[in-house]
From Swiss-Prot:
Residues 1-62 are annotated as: Disordered. Binds to the 23S rRNA. Belongs to the universal ribosomal protein uL15 family. It comes from Leptospira interrogans serogroup Icterohaemorrhagiae serovar Lai (strain 56601). GO terms for molecular function: rRNA binding; structural constituent of ribosome. HAMAP family: Ribosomal_uL15 (MF_01341). It holds the Pfam family Ribosomal_L27A. Keywords: Ribonucleoprotein, Ribosomal protein, RNA-binding, rRNA-binding. Part of the 50S ribosomal subunit. The lineage of its organism: Bacteria, Pseudomonadati, Spirochaetota, Spirochaetia, Leptospirales. This is Large ribosomal subunit protein uL15. One of its GO terms (biological process) is translation. Gene3D superfamilies: 3.100.10.10.
Length: 180
């Protein structure tokens, strides 16, 4: 049977012979129960298909021609236009990535900790990411952290352990002033 198909393929060209579905993957080895998959309905392909001409949409009218757009309420003033505009997005708003003391303790960081070290220990993705140290967890060793922000509880816990904190913005200002 297979040889005959190959001979036919060489005689008529490979595009003339129907290809069998790939059945060598593990998911295809298990037979699919009858009725588990439903074939897509081909509509609008002539009267012999039983869903030709109007393609199951009834005859004429708004719904036969196209769909109604999202949020359309039949001509009534839609809710997104009935409700007033409110607020704005500040262009000065900064989004801080939260870093808990628990994360620093878990990664085993000690000594001076800044963005570069946090990227190396995979706490942060990039050095340029703004991050804030939060106080969830305990810190046992003295650490000296340079970050963009600190919560009150994080400040207390770091200083209690004998560490220190510095804001990255203050360091940038100090270095820019010394360059002048």
């Amino acid at each position: 049977m297979k040889k005959e198909r190959l001979e036919q393929a060489s005689a008529f060209g490979k595009d003339r012979v129907k290809k069998k579905k790939n059945t060598d993957t593990s998911s295809n080895l298990i037979p699919v129960p009858k009725g588990a998959t439903k074939e897509k309905k081909r509509v609008g392909r002539g009267p012999g298909s039983k869903v030709g001409k109007t393609a199951g949409r009834g005859s004429k009218g708004q719904y036969a021609r196209n769909t109604v757009r999202r949020g359309f309420e039949g001509g009534q003033m839609p809710i997104h236009r009935r409700l007033p505009k409110r607020g704005f997005t500040s262009k000065f708003h900064k989004e801080f990535y939260p870093v808990n003391l628990r994360d620093i303790e878990k990664s085993g960081l000690t000594g001076n900790i800044d963005a570069k070290i946090m990227v190396q220990s995979k706490i942060l993705d990039k050095e340029t990411t703004l991050f804030k140290i939060l106080g969830t967890g305990e810190i046992k060793k003295a650490i000296h952290v340079i970050a963009d922000g600190f919560s009150q509880s994080a400040k207390e816990k770091i200083e209690k352990a004998g560490g220190s904190i510095k804001l990255r913005a203050e360091l940038k200002l100090a270095t820019s002033e010394t360059k002048k």
